[in-house]
Amino acid sequence: MSRKRYIVSFLITTGATCGLYAQQQTVVDNRGKAVSVMIPTASETMAGYVDVDYLDDKFYNSSIQTGFGNTPSTNATEPENSMEIIDRKMRNLSEMMTMTCNEEVKKYIDRYTKAGRQSTCYLLGRARYYNPIFEEALRFYGLPLELKYLPVIESGLNPNATSRVGAAGLWQFMATTGKQYDLQIDSYIDERRDPEKSSYAAARMLSDLYKQFGDWTLALAAYNCGPGRVNSAITKAGGGADFWAVYQHLPKETRGYVPAFIAANYVMNYYADYNITPLSTGLPNRCDTVIVEKDVTLAKVANVLGMNVDDLKTLNPQYRQGLIKAFATNGVAKLRLPSEMIEKYKKYKEQIYQNETTNEEPNMTIAATHISQKGILY
């Protein structure tokens, strides 16, 4: 988004040479297996770049189980990866967006697949949950589905990611921009963190930017630094058909933004070439949405359904105080639940709405627990 400068996880701006701060996580999954893994967190690596606060560590750093039941290899495999071969594969990724490989893009591919490969494993796992949400919004506006990888570089696929300048959510909306695109932000709800609503808002904004610039690389640059700066870069360049034509006149962080996006598209599709496999994140395989008819706390819902309240908050990060105000939201209030909980919710709906509290401990956990200490990933 515009008006913010930061990096997420393993992304380093072009020219940065310092290591990424990370947490060494001792992860305990639901089977009781403990393994130490390095999970990068955003850190200040250059003057002007600020970190992102990852607040849902439970899910972001949860299980080390891969989709195949094995811990992924930590050794990068070197496939046949000349720029010509990568460029040929990249051109097969999209019919609507032009993506090519050059030295800048290759730098980010290397970072995703080498120093940042553990982060890539987690991002692949989280993408299985979030991509269907993104794709639905992108299809609604007739946009390239490849844009679903934009939150990879915006937020590390973390709806609770918050930049120091106040950008929030998967798509990193500033409050003013979020309200411009009809996202409700108040003391009870922040729809910038709502995966579904923020995705529709982001798709609408990207559609507007593409209509303005007529090129997806320029639209992406404008999403990062704002249309004004892109127009200024075009003027300084004496006109420009795409991002690469105005590259030298863009802000430093934006020069790395589009190459990082292109690299993310490539790696998220060809990760197997680098011996990278998705990690299970503890997020449910499928979710559905129910309408909330009365004010209710997430703690009450979790207690009646036998869920862990932190799991429920992770699926519904937009509710700032853990309280759903049924008639205080735009449209109707919604609650996202694992699909297997929908019928149970309907069955016990009246009990959920009863004005009573309980101290009973929830008895189901869908994510692992962890302990951590600071470490460094190079």
Where in this protein do the model-derived segments appear?
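Short, functionally critical alpha-helical segments immediately adjacent to catalytic or ligand/cofactor-binding
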Residues: L143-N160, A219-G226, N265, L312-N316
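Primarily a LysM-type cell-wall glycan-binding module
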Residues: L279-G306, E360-Y378
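Substrate-binding/active-site groove segments that recognize
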Residues: V165-S187, S199-A201, L206, V230
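An acidic, Gly/Ser/Thr/Pro-rich helix-cap/linker signature
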Residues: Y6, G19-Y141
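Secretory-pathway/luminal and periplasmic proteins that interact with or process carbohydrate-rich
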Residues: G156-R164, Q180, L209-Q212, P227-G240, ...
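Second-shell loop/turn segments in exported
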Residues: T113-L124, F134-E136, F140, P159-A167, ...
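Extracellular LysM carbohydrate-binding repeats and other cell-envelope/extracellular binding modules
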Residues: L250, L315-I352, K374
